[in-house]
Each structure stands twice: as structure tokens, then as C-alpha cells.
Amino acid sequence: MGCDGGTIPKRHELVKGPKKVEKVDKDAELVAQWNYCTLSQEILRRPIVACELGRLYNKDAVIEFLLDKSSEKALGKAASHIKSIKNVTELRLSDNPAWEGDKGSTKGDKHDDLQRARFICPVVGLEMNGRHRFCYLRCCGCVFSERALKEIKAEVCHTCGAAFQEDDVIVLNGTKEDVAMLQTRMEERRLRAKLGKKTKKPKAAESVSKSDISEEAPGPSKMKAGKPEETSLDSREKKTSSAPRSAAAHGSSSGKAGKPVCGAPKRSIADSGESEAYKSLFTTHSSAKRSKEESAHWVTHTSYCF
């Protein structure tokens, strides 16, 4: 029954029960949230950005995540809600003057104070180490403690003076309830942005169609300054001159000689009041008529034979 040496095993040593849930050290969890990038798990270094859920990232890690097209990208669930660089905001952090960094523990003879933070609240002076709630503004990226926003109520930023609304305040590394609330606000914000884009497209199309119609529509005719009698006479002369031209053009296009206008009277140069010198240019003049003796030989071809 016993083992060597006379020992008897007990029940709790032989029967395996349920494993105890391992408790995470709160200090280690806070250090991981406030000092390391959520995506790459590297130490936070400027420029530092935050998403709409209040998580901290290195900006270069976010850019690499967006540029990565491989299948391993699906593993980054912590940044699955980041679709573009516009979904993150670069933070304006205030340095802690008491922060020594790695200089104090280079020899290993000093204690590392995990409660000492790199950044502080510029209004109250609280250290951003996770013991106090901090938030940032989406409009400008300035970071404050929640106590500062509650004690000094204002509608403008305490640092840069930019106006903000309650929807622009996002809690950094909040609780599960805070993350759920920020998730709903993010979805509503993106839905409003999509609806705004859809309403802008038909408005732009309507403006383009109206401009085309205004260009094609004839404008009001403007009368030139002058006497009404002169304008009416000019219009009549233009109409009469355009009529024979159109008739001639129609005849030439059809290939047949255009017929003279029936209304146009025939006139003779002999009956006109022109000078004798002008009339002598034509063959119908008396000086152009010759007798048979003066006429040329029948072989000679001249216009006078006809």
C-alpha cells in the first residue's frame, strides 16, 4: 500500500482537481498597458498614437500593420478596427521632469520604481502610470487626467485652446464598460460619416446637371443700341440677300443649275443709265457690231460669230 520508506500517498496527491485561475499581477498589467505598444509589444516611443478605443500604439507599428497584406495580418485582433491612419490620433504628451529612464538603473544597484511614469497631466501634475484615469481629445490629441477635466470644466482644450465636444473625449486604457461604450460611439460616428458621403454625392450631381442646363439654355437676346428703323431695314436686306444665296447653294449641291428667281426682273445694259464707256465693254454695244466685210474668216473662232 505504501511507497518505499513507509510513506502513504494521500488523495489530493493522486486525484487531479481543477486548476486554479492564475491571478495577473496588477502592477505588471499596468506597466504593460502604459509602457508598451498594444500591437507590436515594444516599448512606446514617440510618435505615440491612440485609437478610438483608447489603446496606445507606436505610429510606425500602425503604418506597418496597414501596409501588411499577408494572411498573418488577421492575427492582429487588437488593431482590427483600424482601417486607415485617420482612425488613430497622434498624442501630445507632457514629459515628466522627475523621469530618469534607464539612467538610474544602469549599474543595477537601485530599485526600479514601476510607479514612476514618463508622462504627466499638464494641468494637475498626476503621473500617467495607470493609477489615475487619463483621456485625450480627438480634435487636437492633447492628453489630460480625468480629474482635470472634471475640476476645470471648459469647452476648449486647456493646452491649445481648441474647441471640443463630449464625444471627442476618449478614455485611455479604460475598463471593459468604457471600451464597450467607446465601441458603440465609434460605430455611430462611422455610420454618420458614411451617410454624409452618400448625401453629398447626389447634391454634387444635381449641381453639375444644373450648370449644364444653364449653359445650354439660350439667354435673353440683347438688342443693340440704335434706331429701330435702321435695325428693321438691315434685317430686311439680310433676308433678301440670303434668299438667292440659299437657292444657289441648293442648286449647286444637287448638281443642277439653279434657276433664277421668278420674281427678279430682267434688265438690259442698253436701257440702263450707265455711261457709254461702260456699255462699250459688252458685245451688245453698237461699236462691237461689225459688218460681214469687217468680220473675221470663218476659220477664225471668235465670240463675235455667235
UniProtKB/Swiss-Prot annotation:
Keyword Repeat carried by entry: no
Bias type Basic and acidic residues, positions: 226-240
Pfam family for this entry, one: Rtf2
Keywords of the record: Chromosome, Phosphoprotein
Region Disordered: start-end pairs: 192-306
UniProt cross-references to InterPro entries, sorted A to Z: Rtf2, Rtf2_RING-finger
CDD domains: RING-like_Rtf2 (cd16653)
Gene Ontology molecular-function annotations: DNA binding
Annotated Gene Ontology cellular component terms: nucleus; replication fork
Compositional bias segments (type: Low complexity): 241-258
Modified residues (Phosphoserine): 287
Residue ranges, compositional bias (Basic residues): 192-202
Modification after translation: Undergoes proteasomal degradation, via DDI1 and DDI2. Removal from stalled replisomes and degradation are required for genome stability.
GO biological process terms on file: cellular response to hydroxyurea; mitotic DNA replication termination; regulation of DNA stability
Compartment annotation: Chromosome
Function of the protein: Replication termination factor which is a component of the elongating replisome. Required for ATR pathway signaling upon DNA damage and has a positive activity during DNA replication. Might function to facilitate fork pausing at replication fork barriers like the rDNA. May be globally required to stimulate ATR signaling after the fork stalls or encounters a lesion. Interacts with nascent DNA.
Subunit structure: Interacts with DDI2; probably also interacts with DDI1.
Family according to the record: Belongs to the rtf2 family.
The protein, known as: Replication termination factor 2
Natural source organism: Sus scrofa
